[in-house]
Amino acid sequence: MDFIEHLLPELLDKILSYLTEKELVTFSKCCVKWREITNKDTLWLHHCMRRGWLRFGLNGDINRETHLNVKMSNIGGNSPVFQLYVPEETRLSPVCKWKNIFIRVHHLNKNWRKGRYSVSPLLKGHAEKVTALACNGKYIVSGSEDKSLRMWDMAQATCIKKLDGHLDTITKIIWKGNTLITGCADSSIRVIDSTNFTLLFSLQGHSGSVDHMTLVGKVLVSAATDRTLRMWYLPDRRLVNIFRGHTDDIECMYSHGTHVVTGSWDKTLILWDIEHAEQFHMYSGHNEVVTCCYFDGEKIVSGSGDNDLRIWRISPPGCSHILQGHEGEVYCLAANHHVIASGSSDSTVRIWNYNGKCQHVLQGHLGIVRCLHICEERLVSGGDQKKVIVWDYKKGVQMNIVHRHPSLLHLMWVNETKLITASPERPGTVAVLSYW
C-alpha cells in the first residue's frame, strides 16, 4: 500500500518541504509516482533560495547557459561540460525549472571547486598590451595601448568588430545595454553604439587621462589625472558639474547608489554626493596612496600603499577600524556583506571581518596579488607568474590553482561561469576560461 495516497496534498507538500535535497532525490527514486511528486518547482525553489541561488533563475537563467563552441584545451578529460541525460522515450515529465537550476548550479560550483575548466584559444589582435576590459557574458570588449577597441565573440574566439579613432591608450570601458563608454588617455570620453561599433558622440573637458568612470543612473561620473571629477548628463551630452578636492592623481573609484568614493595619491578618500552635486566628506588617515576602495552605502573600506586597510564610518564620519597585517602594499580588495578580502605585494590574500579581525591568511601566490573577485561561493585571486587561485574564503582553504592559465595577467573579469584575464605583455592578449 502506498501511504502517500492517504495524505492530503497540502500535508504531503509540508512533509516534503522538510526533506533535504539529497533526501528528495532518494525519495524520487522509489517509483515513478514519487518522482513526479518531488518534481515540483515549489520544493526546489525552496532549496535554491536556501542556498542563495535565486539569481541563477531570476537575474539570468542558467538553463539557457551555453558552452563555448570553439576547440578548447582540456587536459586529462576533466571537462566542465554539463550533460543531463534524458531518455528519448520516457514516462517521466520534464525536469521542472528550479530542480534543473539546482542540478546545474550544483554542477557549476563543483567545477569551480574541483578545478574543472576549459581554456579557449588566446584572443590575439592588439598590437600593444590590453589596458581595459568589459564583458556582457557573451561578448568581450577590450581596449589597448594600440588605441583600438575590439569586440570578441567568446563562443568562437574571434574578433568580430574593431574601432579605431582613439588618439591614445584606452584606459576604461563601461558596457551598459547597447552602449559602450570609453575613457582615454587623450582626455576624451567616447560613447559608442555596441551593435554596430560606431561613435555616437564624445565628451570633452578633462585636461588629463580619463582613468576612472562610473554610471549613476543617467549621469556619467569621470575622474582624470587632472585631479577632477566631472558629472555628465548623457541624454543631452551635457557637463553638469566639476568636482575639485583631491590635490594629487585619483587612483581608485567605487560607486553605490547616488554616491561615489574616490581614493588618491594625496592619501585621502572623498565621498561625493552625486544627487546633490556636492562633496560629502574627506577621509584622512592613510600614510601613502589609497590604491583601492569599496563602498556599500553604510561604510567605506580602503587599501593603501602603507600596507593597511581602513574601515570608515559614514555617520558620524571617521575611521572605525585599522586592519593591519600585510607586509607589503595593498593592491586590491573585494568585499561583500560578510567579509573583506585584500591582496598585497607580500603575496598573500587576507580575509577580514568588519570588526577589523583577520580571519584567514591565504598563501599560494608568488609576487603581487593584483586582482580579486568575491561572490557567495568563492574568492578568485589573480597575480604575478600567471597564477590564478580559487579559494573557499569561508574556511580559508585553497580549492584549486588554475594551472593552465596561458599568460601573465593584470586585469581580471569573473562571472558565474567564465574567468577572463588580460595580459600586461605586448602584443596584447585576452584569455578565456570556461567553468561550464
Language model segments and positions:
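WD40-repeat beta-propellers
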Residues: 149-153, 173, 189-193, 213, ...
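Solenoidal tandem-repeat scaffolds enriched in leucines and small polar residues
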Residues: 207-209, 213-312, 321
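A structural motif specific to WD40 beta-propellers
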Residues: 118-121, 158-161, 198-201, 238-241, ...
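C-terminal interaction modules of eukaryotic adaptor/scaffold proteins
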Residues: 381-436
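WD40/WD-repeat beta-propeller blade N-cap
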Residues: 51, 123-130, 164-170, 204-210, ...
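Intrinsically disordered, low-complexity acidic/Ser/Thr/Pro-rich linker and tail segments
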Residues: 1-5, 22, 28-29, 33-151, ...
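Conserved strand-to-loop turn within each blade of WD40 beta-propeller repeats
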Residues: 143-146, 183-186, 223-226, 263-266, ...
